[in-house]
């Protein structure tokens, strides 16, 4: 079936788009947007924003989230990211705090992480849509099957990618990744409830930049 997505991703995922579960997923999502109007996030054109912003071969880092923000106007299709006119959520505030601590730089007070994506950071939510005010409302419609395949495809076809797995949900994806050719960094989730259990002080961003340098890759400006 035809899916509007960046061309290199379309090639990598074409067999996935033809599977029964994905066709059922698309049918469900279309009906959700039709019947619930503006209460499904992100807007339809941004569902695959993480893919459209970053061609497959340019991935250097994967940061895995769970599902989109469920408040109006927040989600923009990139994990942990919000639109630039939206107040920075607590988890992202802690991410910026850890960057400033470990890299000794001042982050830009803007929650739109498109600037990271354009440099090679794949900001992937495991579940790509959500209903307003109902976190994890779309967790069982097929998105996890799809994004698990995405992770496996990245692991198989690319080399020396950094995977940042924050929290138990993300850590559960470790089994999908070839640890012999990629760097996996694990710690607690940056949420205020768990950031002090390892995330703050993890040095994930400095470790990432060092790994990219060691493998002769252009580093990422995480400001």
Swiss-Prot record:
InterPro entries assigned to the protein according to its UniProt record, in alphabetical order: UDG_fam1, Ura-DNA_Glyclase_AS, Uracil-DNA_glycosylase-like, Uracil-DNA_glycosylase-like_sf
BP GO annotations: base-excision repair, AP site formation via deaminated base removal
Catalytic reaction list: Hydrolyzes single-stranded DNA or mismatched double-stranded DNA and polynucleotides, releasing free uracil
Gene3D superfamilies: Uracil-DNA glycosylase-like domain
E.C. no: 3.2.2.27
Subcellular location: Cytoplasm
PROSITE patterns reported in the protein's UniProt record: U_DNA_GLYCOSYLASE (PS00130)
SUPFAM superfamilies membership: Uracil-DNA glycosylase-like
Active site per the UniProt annotation: 67
The keyword Transcription belongs to this UniProt entry's keyword annotation: no
GO molecular function, one term: uracil DNA N-glycosylase activity
Superkingdom of this protein's organism: Bacteria
Alphabetical UniProt keywords: Cytoplasm, DNA damage, DNA repair, Hydrolase
Transmembrane segment boundaries: none
Any single Gene Ontology cellular-component annotation: cytoplasm
Keyword Phosphoprotein: no
Stated role: Excises uracil residues from the DNA which can arise as a result of misincorporation of dUMP residues by DNA polymerase or due to deamination of cytosine.
Entry similarity comment: Belongs to the uracil-DNA glycosylase (UDG) superfamily. UNG family.
The protein, known as: Uracil-DNA glycosylase
Species in which this protein is naturally found: Borrelia recurrentis (strain A1)
Lineage per the UniProt record: Bacteria, Pseudomonadati, Spirochaetota, Spirochaetia, Spirochaetales
């Amino acid at each position: 079936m035809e899916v509007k997505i960046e061309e290199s991703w379309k090639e990598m995922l074409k067999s996935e788009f033809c599977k029964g579960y994905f066709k059922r997923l698309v049918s469900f999502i279309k009906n959700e947007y039709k019947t619930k109007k503006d209460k499904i996030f992100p807007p339809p054109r941004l569902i695959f924003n993480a893919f459209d912003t970053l061609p497959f071969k340019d991935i250097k880092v994967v940061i895995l989230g769970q599902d989109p923000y469920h408040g109006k106007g927040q989600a923009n299709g990139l994990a942990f990211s919000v639109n630039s006119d939206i107040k920075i959520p607590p988890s992202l505030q802690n991410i910026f705090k850890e960057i400033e601590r470990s890299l000794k730089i001042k982050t830009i007070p803007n929650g739109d992480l498109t600037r990271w994506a354009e440099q090679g950071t794949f900001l992937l939510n495991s579940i790509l849509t959500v209903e307003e005010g109902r976190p994890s409302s779309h967790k069982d419609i097929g998105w996890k099957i799809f994004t698990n395949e995405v992770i496996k495809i990245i692991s198989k076809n690319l080399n020396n990618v950094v995977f940042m797995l924050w929290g138990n949900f993300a850590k559960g994806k470790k089994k999908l990744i070839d640890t012999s050719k990629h760097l996996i960094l694990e710690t607690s989730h940056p949420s205020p409830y768990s950031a002090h259990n390892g995330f703050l002080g993890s040095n994930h961003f400095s470790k990432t930049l060092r790994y990219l340098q060691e493998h002769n890759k252009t580093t990422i400006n995480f400001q």
